[in-house]
Every structure is written in C-alpha cells, then in structure tokens.
Amino acid sequence: TSSFLVPRDTKGLTVARCNETLGCRFMNNGELVFEDMFVPDDHLLVEGTALAKAGVYFQPGKIIQAAKNLGVGVRCLEVTSDYVQNYMQGGRILIKHQAVALRLAEMATRIEAVRALLERASEAVDEGAADADALCNMVKYYASEEIMKVATHAAELHGGNGMMLDFGVEKLFRDAAIFPHMDGTVDISKFKIVKALYPATAGKYAGRED
C-alpha cells in the first residue's frame, strides 16, 4: 500500500456529508468521495509500505483515546461524588445509603485500574518495549468497558436527573459510549492482544493447521 497527500481543494475530492455522533462531538466525521482525481507524483508520501508504517501511530493513538476515556471517568466520579454528598433522599444524603456508597467504591476502583494500565502502556510505548502493542490494545479495550460502567453508575446515581441536560451526566454517558468504537472496536483490540501474546499460533504469520 502507498499513501498520498491530497490537498482539500484537489479536483475530484468532495466531502459528501458530515455525520453527527452520539457523543464525542468534538470530532469531524465526514464521508470522502474520490472521483476521477489526479494526484501528482510529488504528493507520494510512502510507497509500498504505508500501512505498515502507519501502524507505528496506532499505539500512541490508543493511548490518547484511553487517556480521553479516563478523563470522562474521572469527571463522572467528580460530579457524582458532589451530587450524592449534597442530595437528600428519605431524610439522609444519598451517600449514607449503602447501595450508593458501594457504587462509588466501584467507580473509584475502576478508574484507578484504568489509570495504572494506561501508565504502564505509555511507558512501554516510550521505551519501545516488545509488549507495547499488546498493552496499548489492552488499555484501549479495558478503558472502554470499565469507563462505560463508571458512566452508567454516574447516570444511575443521579436518578432521573442523570438524563437531564442541565446536569451534564448524560453528555458524559454519551461520550463514554463512543470510545468502544474508536480506533477499532473492542473485539479487534482483543484479537490484537491474542496475536501479540501468541504469535506462533494466533499471529499473522502463524503456521497452517494440519
């Protein structure tokens, strides 16, 4: 595969439409159409090995997505902690209810587990470690699933207010729902983890089964 630089004003390149997303609306998601488009030779960036070279950027990309996701989780815990320590129900603040307190403990633990794995994966990428690819995919999928649980607890602990625009929790919930699908799905990350851990039997160049 080869890669080319295509300026936005290139004849034959059009943006068919831009899609709105459930969450993470800071992104621009557009459908590109290439029709009878001429790209000059001097716009060639990488010849023959573009996909392999692009893979170098997949690792930090997953780190960045996991870090954004962690930020969503941290904010979920912040706003929920404030809410349950001030909102009264049945004559008591919410945090005095055992079920509420247990959910807070789960949220905090999940956030710290994601943070620890994110730090380890980041160090592996910086050091060029052999297990960097596996760790990047681990933190991508783990953060996606765990922070979604954190956001769900945040919405639940706000009760009906969790679905109200004024409280902001619904936005965090929508953002958390996007991350499992960014930079590859969770299942794709799991496949990559297995291939990295067991290259001889599950990897791209594994031998044929007899």
Segments predicted by a language model, with ranges:
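Charge-rich, acidic-biased intrinsically disordered regions
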Residues: 96, 100, 133-141, 162-178
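Active-site lining segments that contact anionic ligands and/or coordinate catalytic metals
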Residues: 1, 29, 60, 99, ...
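Glycine-rich beta->alpha junctions and the first turn(s) of the following alpha-helix
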Residues: 3, 13-112, 179, 195, ...
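C-terminal helix-coil-helix/basic helical segment that borders enzyme active sites and/or dimer interfaces
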Residues: 81-95, 108-142, 155-160
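Generic, well-ordered alpha-helical scaffold segments in large soluble proteins
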Residues: 76-83, 120, 124, 153, ...
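Conserved H-D interstitial segment of serine endopeptidase catalytic domains
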Residues: 6-8
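Hydrophobic alpha-helical segments of membrane proteins
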Residues: 146-154
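Glycine-rich phosphate/cofactor-binding loops in nucleotide/flavin-utilizing enzymes
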Residues: 158-210
